């Protein structure tokens, strides 16, 4: 029996996918990435050779994608596009791969994955922000002791605290929404020689067909579009990790100021009520800095095409989007329906809360203006 380890439902970490509720499974899978290569080739035929577009589409539609087999063959040439184009041209070369190089198709396919995957992260962040806004409004005057450098400090309000979470989450969502996902089209050495002088015209049409951003430039060896996406994702992961860390602290037995709606148990200690969602969020988010570092290291894209640095991006960027989605999803689960033990909070307060309520109100104003 053929192994199913490359089935589209298992091409990513199962734990990571389930933690993100599964929504990001399809957009970031290896199968979708490879299918997007075909999507880009079909769009390129329309943009570069419209007279052959129908034949190219028929060729692509007739192609039977075998993810496992194509992945094996990709190792021989260093990327999956080489054997894919060979297969397509063997069926009918008309309209296939006009004026493009492997990097054009692969980078554009990756951007299709990321546009959808990042959009799913934004949706989760917005859900979290809505819940935080409700929490902030409800508890803007709820007194709690502030803590700095791990020690009891001065009184504040729980709403002021969650207001800080809210603004950071909203900022992270807006940064992701502002990202551009550029199409790539430059040809063999990035100078559009084969299609001169129509290169940028074709690029613009290709961007339109795919719903991607037209950079009006060739970015083969400029990997800043990748690091821009990666930075925004890693920032979002860090933002929710901070929230998760706070929830874990406030949920400690000796603190007891918060309790998740559905806390996790223990296989050996049945009395425990672990803040499982916050803990999982922390775990996923901790993977983001290492993935981000790999992508920044890939900025060293030598000459006109990276030797290994470019190849390192394909899985790493999708993995970063996946762990960020999982982290945000777990943070949203942690906050949704969380119990705020106001009496326990108040029992530790030793004075007035100052102007903390004003800060909670301001956080709500900032959030409201950003979404109006």
Annotate each PLM feature.
Residues 162, 196, 203-236:
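Conserved beta-strand/loop scaffold segments within soluble protein domains that form the structured core
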Residues 287-359:
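Long, amphipathic alpha-helical stalk/connector segments used for oligomerization, subunit docking
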Residues 43-47, 87, 91, 131, ...:
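Generic, well-ordered alpha-helical scaffold segments in large soluble proteins
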Residues 172, 187, 219-303:
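Glycine-rich anion/phosphate-binding loop at the beta-strand->alpha-helix junction
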Residues 14-17, 142, 203-219, 256-257, ...:
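Acidic-glycine-rich active-site phosphate/pyrophosphate-binding loop
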Residues 115-122, 126, 133, 163-166, ...:
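Short amphipathic alpha-helical segments with heptad-repeat character
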Residues 1-186, 192, 200-205, 214, ...:
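A helix-coil-helix interface module used to build multimeric assemblies
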Residues 25-29, 69-71, 264-280, 302-319, ...:
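Short beta-alpha connecting loops at secondary-structure transitions
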